[in-house]
Curated annotation (Swiss-Prot):
<dbReference type="InterPro" id="IPR001844">
    <property type="entry name" value="Cpn60/GroEL"/>
</dbReference>
<feature type="binding site">
    <location>
        <position position="414"/>
    </location>
    <ligand>
        <name>ATP</name>
    </ligand>
</feature>
<dbReference type="GO" id="GO:0042026">
    <property type="term" value="P:protein refolding"/>
</dbReference>
<dbReference type="GO" id="GO:0016853">
    <property type="term" value="F:isomerase activity"/>
</dbReference>
<dbReference type="GO" id="GO:0140662">
    <property type="term" value="F:ATP-dependent protein folding chaperone"/>
</dbReference>
<dbReference type="InterPro" id="IPR027409">
    <property type="entry name" value="GroEL-like_apical_dom_sf"/>
</dbReference>
<dbReference type="GO" id="GO:0009408">
    <property type="term" value="P:response to heat"/>
</dbReference>
<comment type="subunit">
    <text>Forms a cylinder of 14 subunits composed of two heptameric rings stacked back-to-back. Interacts with the co-chaperonin GroES.</text>
</comment>
<dbReference type="InterPro" id="IPR027413">
    <property type="entry name" value="GROEL-like_equatorial_sf"/>
</dbReference>
<feature type="binding site">
    <location>
        <position position="50"/>
    </location>
    <ligand>
        <name>ATP</name>
    </ligand>
</feature>
<keyword id="KW-0413">Isomerase</keyword>
<comment type="function">
    <text>Together with its co-chaperonin GroES, plays an essential role in assisting protein folding. The GroEL-GroES system forms a nano-cage that allows encapsulation of the non-native substrate proteins and provides a physical environment optimized to promote and accelerate protein folding.</text>
</comment>
<feature type="binding site">
    <location>
        <begin position="86"/>
        <end position="90"/>
    </location>
    <ligand>
        <name>ATP</name>
    </ligand>
</feature>
<dbReference type="GO" id="GO:0051082">
    <property type="term" value="F:unfolded protein binding"/>
</dbReference>
<keyword id="KW-0067">ATP-binding</keyword>
<keyword id="KW-0963">Cytoplasm</keyword>
<keyword id="KW-0547">Nucleotide-binding</keyword>
């Protein structure tokens, strides 16, 4: 297919048009008074959202060059959401403002490479000032405030997230699911839970709930398949002398071994239960090791030179309580050493940082949460499917932003943090580097101005008023008052502000230093040929009707 090439200003102007259209659609969602955007779906009801990244993801433009510009900024919004959970609209507004200011200067003759260098230096200096101004998240109240703001000022969601984080800790897994009713709920699973239930319903100890509960139990962990009773008989005899219940976690237990265990359980000879090991392949081995560390046991594996026949009681893990239903096993109060658990947690965190696969990262985070003390499930309720999707998106965003706040700390919100940080930056740059520096200094006012405009105020007037002051002074767009932002609980995670600025500068630099674009020429489809009318020849005979 033939390609068309656009050069210099004509290329950049078309790219800018795409960025402008994306920005204009996304900017209306910004701030506590942001508006909704209605999005047509290929099937079903349209979706309604106030989430910037959801709007950005839907945008495809007909002009191929403009669309390239829009797609680049869309990627920035997505990356900001992935890394920080929030700040997508901030990143989009910043990228547009930087590109707009930069394009004006480059069209006037500034050197794009020098301008880029100045922009990078200014952004780095502002981020350093943001870090100095940040403070650690102190307690549940501040976590609630961050979550509430990220959930578009929904205090109920903010409180649910704060409760969940309080119960499972900052490394715990918090998942979001759809509730069956219209009420929001929080469900917390203490201890380590994995998705394997009992191998036989005859292991049940509570017939009403159909669960098996073992108190102060031993845990046998092995990556072997147990099919013969003689494999585990010596160990069973040793545990019987101790008078404690036993949970067997193995690759599988089948045939004679399972039958014998069930019969002895029913006769009251053994207080025992058996489940399959969680996971598959190498992940199964790692999860068995996790359980071993949590319970102070040892995985009996031939790879380690250990066999079931010669296993000692010292190899068994211990737990205060184990609850098993048909789908899940929960181990509470594992008796492993806390320093061993901490070492394992640190090891998994290192693996999370180094992996590039989203799937592997998700599975590692699940393992981390199981070791760190639990899983919380936020169940989101809504009256309709459209409302459910919109609310679920908000909860996901708020959750990620809250984790970002706990990780790196918080700064004043409402777009004021960037202005405060910029006030403390004074770089001695020259020529076109200085132009790049000044572009950033003007562009960082855009988020605050847009928040004010969406709330019905004059953006320029609000920015000027905030610039006259120092410290935590900012603009509360909810009521139009100038307040101490920390005292009012109007705060943003540092990570959100940092990543939004870094990503915006990165994409703007790429766009400003673009000198040519290449795109396919759309072929005009020929009009379909007229259908063959040959079959109508007989109409000639109609002359006889005259």
């Amino acid at each position: 297919m033939a390609k068309e090439i656009k050069f210099s200003d004509s290329a950049r102007n078309l790219l800018f048009e795409g960025v402008r259209q994306l920005h204009d659609a996304v900017k209306v969602t910004m701030g506590p008074r942001g508006r909704n955007v209605l999005i047509q779906k290929s099937y079903g009801a349209p979706s309604i959202t106030k989430d910037g990244v959801s709007v950005a993801k839907e945008i495809e433009l007909s002009c191929p060059v403009a669309n390239m510009g829009a797609q680049l900024v869309k990627e920035v919004a997505s990356k900001t959401a992935d890394a920080a959970g929030d700040g997508t609209t901030t990143a989009t507004v910043l990228a547009y403002s930087i590109f707009k200011e930069g394009l004006r200067n480059i069209t006037a003759g500034a050197n794009p490479i020098e301008v880029k260098r100045g922009m990078d230096k200014a952004a780095e200096a502002i981020i350093n000032e943001l870090k100095k101004a940040s403070k650690k998240v102190g307690g549940k109240e501040e976590i609630t405030q961050v979550a509430t703001i990220s959930a578009n000022s929904d205090h109920n969601i903010g409180k649910l997230i704060a409760d969940a984080m309080e119960k499972v800790g900052k490394d715990g897994v918090i998942t979001v699911e759809e509730a069956k009713g219209i009420e929001d709920e929080l469900d917390v699973v203490e201890g380590m839970q994995f998705d394997r239930g009992y191998l036989s319903p005859y292991f049940v100890t509570n017939a009403e709930k159909m669960t098996a509960q073992l108190d102060n139990a031993y845990i046998l962990l092995t990556d072997k398949k147990i099919s013969s009773m003689k494999d585990i008989l010596p160990l069973l005899e040793k545990t019987m002398k101790e008078g404690k219940p036993l949970l067997i976690i193995a690759e599988d237990i089948e045939g004679e071994a399972l039958t014998t265990l069930v019969v002895n359980k029913l006769r009251g000879v053994l207080n025992i239960a058996a489940v399959k090991a969680p996971g598959f392949g190498d992940r199964r081995k790692e999860m068995l090791k996790d359980i071993a560390i949590l319970t102070g046991g040892q995985v009996i594996s031939e790879e380690l030179g250990l066999s079931l026949e010669n296993a000692e009681v010292e190899f068994l893990g211990k737990a205060g309580r184990i609850v098993i239903d048909k789908d899940n096993t929960t181990i509470v109060d594992g008796k492993g050493h806390s320093h061993d658990v901490k070492d394992r947690v640190a090891q998994i965190k290192t693996q999370i940082a180094s992996t590039t696969s989203d799937y592997d990262k998700e599975k590692l985070q699940e393992r981390l949460a199981k070791l760190s003390g639990g899983v919380a499930v936020i169940k989101v309720g809504a009256a309709s499917e459209v409302e459910m999707k919109e609310k679920k998106d908000r909860v996901d965003d708020a959750l990620s932003a809250t984790k970002a706040a706990v990780e790196e700390g918080i700064v004043i919100g409402g777009g004021a943090a960037l202005i405060r940080a910029a006030q403390k930056v004074h770089l001695n740059l020259h020529d076109d580097e200085k132009v790049g520096y000044e572009i950033i200094m003007r562009a960082i006012k855009a988020p605050l101005a847009q928040i004010a405009i969406n709330a019905g105020y004059d953006g320029g007037v609000v920015v000027n008023e905030v610039e006259k002051h120092e410290g935590h002074f900012g603009f509360n767009a909810s009521n139009g008052k100038y307040v101490d932002m920390f005292k009012e609980g109007i705060i943003d995670p540092l990570k959100v502000e940092r990543i939004a600025l870094q990503n915006a500068v990165s994409v703007s630099s790429l766009l400003l230093t673009t000198e040519a674009t290449v795109h396919e020429i759309k072929e005009e489809k020929a009009a379909p040929a007229m259908p063959d009318m040959g079959g109508m020849g007989g109409m000639g005979g109609m002359g006889g009707m005259m």
